[in-house]
Amino acid sequence: MEGSAYTERTLSIAEALHARFPGLVGTVIQAYLHRSDRDLERLIDLKMRVRLVKGAYAEPARLALQRPSEINEAFIRLMERLLEAGRYPAIASHDPALIRATRGFALRMAIDPGRWEFQMLYGVRRDAQLALAREGYGMRTYLPFGVDWYPYFARRIAERPANMFFVLRQLMTR
């Protein structure tokens, strides 16, 4: 999902498509937006697939959490709700702490790894992607393409600058 200016329109379009093509449409929730708890409940009620991300756009404090610790707390809260009630949710993060929190919660709650998946950007933390897949977790690697692939990729790097080191290391080890 793009910036907050598009959130309501994106969700409305996703809901309309989901009504027409049930089970074939999903959308993204950005954990850092203040509205995300309500949006997530709406999507769970509709039984729509949801991909959870932290959120990567500069948003004002009136719309979004600003502190990384608060964003992580929101991500974990939403992740737990999604794993409990979601329809094959996607937990999209490269953050080792959030991956550990997700694995730990799923294990404590006996939520089968076949009911959800991790998602990561192509070229970022490939070692973690392979390890998660070997451990039996669903692992989807996504690759931006088209005319706007580079701005999308740059936002992922800006969201977590350490990702650039992961990408560079992957390029150097090939």
Kindly give the residue locations of the regions a language model identified.
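Positively charged, amphipathic and often flexible ligand-engagement surfaces
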Residues: 1-174
